[in-house]
Amino acid sequence: TATKAPEALANLQQLITSAGGSIADLTVSCAQYLQIFNEGIHYSFIASVAAMLISLIIFFVSQKTFPTPAKKIAAQNVSYTPEEKAAMAKEIKQRMYALFAVLGIVIFFWFSFHQNGMSLSFFARDFVDSSAVAPEVWQAINPFFVIALTPVIMAIFGGLAKRGKEISTPRKIAIGMFIAGTAFLFLAVFSLIKGYPSANDFKLLPIAEQMANKAHWWVLIATYFFLTVAELFISPLGLSFVSKVAPKSMLGLCQGLWLAATALGNLLLWIGPLMYNAWPIWQCWTVFFIVCLVSMGVMLGMVKWLERVTK
C-alpha cells in the first residue's frame, strides 16, 4: 500500500470501511477480499455447470415431445419461366427491404437498451444510493427478470393467439419500443423532480449534499423491469422475424445482419455518457425516450406493409 497514490489509497480505505472492514491492517483486509472474490468466482462456475447439466437432463427427458425433424429432400433441377423468375426476384427484394427496415429500427433499440452498460451504470454509481445492495446483485437484475418474465409474456402471447387475437411480430416490436421509452420517460420525470444537474456538476457538490439527494435503489429496479420487458418483446421476436422473412438461400446471412444491427447500435453508445456528463440528467433520458418513441412511430407506420410481406 505504500506505493499507492494518496487518492487511490483513500478510495481503498473508503471501500473497506463501507464494506464493514478494518483499515488498521490493509493487508489483512485485501487478503479477505481476494479470498471472498475467488470463492465467488468458483461458485459462479459451479452454478453455470449445474444449470447446463439440468438443461441437458431436460433435453433428454423431453426428447420424445420434440417435433420430428424435416427430412432432407433431394435437390431437383427445376426450370422457371421468365415471368416466374421476375416474380420471385420481386418477392425477394420485398423481403429484404422489410428486413432492412426492421434492422434499422432495432439499431436504435440496442442503442437505448445497452445504455445499461454505459450511462445507466454511471447513473447507478453517481445518483443512486446502492449501499444496501451489493454490486453483484445489480448484475443479476436483468437476467432474473428475463427468466421470471419470459414464461409470463409467452403465456400472454399464446393466450391471445388461441383467442384469434395474435399480435404480429412487427406490432410486438413497436410495443417493445414503447415499453423501452416508458423506462426512460420514468427516469426523465424522476430526475426532473429531483432537480439533478449534469453528472459533472453533481460531482462538484459536497459529499453530504450528494448523499442526501441520491435516489433509492428501487428506481433502478423499476427501470430495468421495463427495459427487460422491452427486450423480451424485441430481441427473440425480432430474430424470429428475420427467420420468417429472409429468403431461404440467405437465412444465415440475414441472421448475421441482425447481429450487425446490434453492433451498430453498440457503436452509438458513446453518445449516452456524452449527454450524461454535459446535460441535466433528465434531458439525457428524454433523448432516449424520444428515440424510442420515434422508432415506435416509424414501426407502426410500416406495420401493414411488414405484415403483408411476412404472409
Q: What is each stretch, according to the model?
A:
Residues I57-V61, A134-R163, I175-L187, G265:
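Transmembrane alpha-helices of Major Facilitator/SLC transporters
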Residues F37-G40, L120, D126-A148, E166-I175, ...:
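Loop-to-transmembrane helix entry
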Residues T1-A132, F157-K165, M302-K311:
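Intracellular loop-helix junctions on the cytosolic face of multi-pass helical membrane proteins
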Residues L232-A246:
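Intracellular juxtamembrane helix-capping segments at the cytosolic ends
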Residues I107-F111, F144, T182, V189, ...:
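Hydrophobic/aromatic residues within the transmembrane alpha-helices of Major Facilitator Superfamily
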Residues S243-Y276:
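A late C-terminal transmembrane helix in Major Facilitator Superfamily
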Residues R171-I234:
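C-terminal transmembrane helical hairpin of 12-TM major facilitator-type secondary transporters
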